[in-house]
């Protein structure tokens, strides 16, 4: 997590309707885990406050969960990738499944793990 938000990402976010911005539940896991393994201190506390603000004030109720449809999409994608000899991190496969099930545009810097997933992807760091 960055101390200062990337200006390209902030500009891209400002151009999106607020109601269109959702977070996959898997991303919340990744963020909470990352904070959980950080050493205690002011940086961790500041980042935890920022994440709580994001979840409670900026995207309240807009969490895209790994439901049955998303799990099915992710499982099919994981099986396809394994058969092709190109497995990808499970968390990214679950995120792809959530995006596929909801027909969402996925904003990520990590295009590589989503190129073959059939998910529409945008890299807001390049805007």
Task: Give residue ranges: language-model regions.
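Short, well-structured N-terminal submotif of metal-dependent ribonuclease cores
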Residues: 1-27, 36-53, 116, 127
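Short amphipathic alpha-helical segments and helix-helix/interface helices
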Residues: 10-14, 96, 111
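Active-site neighborhoods of divalent-metal-dependent phosphate/nucleic-acid chemistry enzymes
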Residues: 20, 33-39, 57-105, 109
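Alpha-helix/helix-capping structural signal
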Residues: 26-29, 69, 112
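Short acidic-hydrophobic, aromatic-tinged amphipathic segments that line or gate anion-handling sites
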Residues: 64-65, 122-124
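Short, C-terminally biased terminal segments at protein or domain edges
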Residues: 112, 123-127
